[in-house]
Amino acid sequence: MSTTFQTPSRLPTVSAWDQFCEWITSTHNRLYVGWFGLLMIPSLFVSAITFMLAWVAAPSVDMEGIREPIISSLLGGSNVITAAVIPTSAAIGLHLYPLWEATSMDEWLYNGGPYQLIILHFLIAIWTYLGRQWELSYRLGMRPWIAMAFSAPVAAATAVLLVYPMGQGSFSEGLPLGISGTFHFMMAVQAEHNILMHPFHMLGVVGVFGGAFLSAMHGSLVTSSLVQETSSLKSVNTGYKFGQQEATYNLLAGHAGYLGRLFIPDIAFRNSRSIHFLLAVLPTIGIWFAALGIGTMAFNLNGFNFNHSLLDSSGRPIRTEADLLNRATMGLQVMHSVNAHHFSLTLASTESKEIPTIPIMTS
């Protein structure tokens, strides 16, 4: 009797690094992490935590660099509307200002150091989120248009938080992080660059408002042309199941049958892909142009200025909308002057800073 011994086959060993790579790139996770997510997640947490702390409890910040600090936190007396994270002081300019560059924590807070910390980590987070969108689309075999559409708001945020301050020479010119601060930034940009008369801003308005109009129109047509699957005694919503393959609405009935009769029949949409393509492209291109407009005005390529009124044959001015806009812009310029505290009036700090004086010798 002979006995045969079979050598067991050795299982392939999987290293910890391979397991980590498999988990990072797996599309079966509840939330896809991805390689971009390794940078996005910590950057987003740092930005969000710092923003919440600064929004609630930050001390006053010398935004203009003239030792007249502005208080903007909730604990400093502001409310939800007026609270904001004040930009880094003009005394810092465009210098990178991490915590270890200041002599103390108080100095770092007084010069608006949290603002740089927030926006730089936030920009890293949103750009890596865009990359994460592309990465997941690639893993699933999808086309990259989702990431392309998201590039528009990413470009807009980059324009107001980084490109514009760099062009103007100081982070103090950036967008304050708050509701009142956003309106302050809008008025300041209008005062300095006449953005309402810039063609790129006009294209941005057309894209955003046009996209909103098309979205409202398409959504109302869809909900008005649902295919009836139930009797008139039951709600139309009970005839559908989430994720079903059959169409739930009649595109031709809504766009060609209804909208075509209201407008011009030949321009009514008869293809679902064309209407959804336009819904994505119009606001995306519009926001791209708006971001490009901020980028050009950052380097003082401003909107059109009509500094002289039209005159009639008698030499009297003919008042137009351009004159009204010029007067409003001049008023905003006065409001945005260094010593005028309109961001906002309730935000002026009561703290007094002692400024050393230099004696002047007279003969």
UniProtKB/Swiss-Prot annotation:
It is a multi-pass membrane protein. Its main location: membrane. Residues 349-363 form a propeptide. The record marks A348, S349 as: Cleavage. It catalyses: 2 a plastoquinone + 4 hnu + 2 H2O = 2 a plastoquinol + O2. The record marks Y164 as: Tyrosine radical intermediate. Keywords: Calcium, Chlorophyll, Chromophore, Electron transport, Herbicide resistance, Iron, Magnesium, Manganese, Membrane, Metal-binding, Oxidoreductase, Photosynthesis, Photosystem II, Thylakoid, Transmembrane, Transmembrane helix, Transport. One of its GO terms (molecular function) is oxidoreductase activity, acting on diphenols and related substances as donors, oxygen as acceptor. It is found in: Cellular thylakoid membrane. The record marks H193 as: Stabilizes free radical intermediate. Fe cation binds at H218, H276. Tyr-164 forms a radical intermediate that is referred to as redox-active TyrZ, YZ or Y-Z. PANTHER family: PHOTOSYSTEM II D2 PROTEIN, PHOTOSYSTEM II PROTEIN D1. Cyanobacteria usually contain more than 2 copies of the psbA gene. Belongs to the reaction center PufL/M/PsbA/D family. This is Photosystem II protein D1 1. It comes from Acaryochloris marina (strain MBIC 11017). The gene is psbA1.
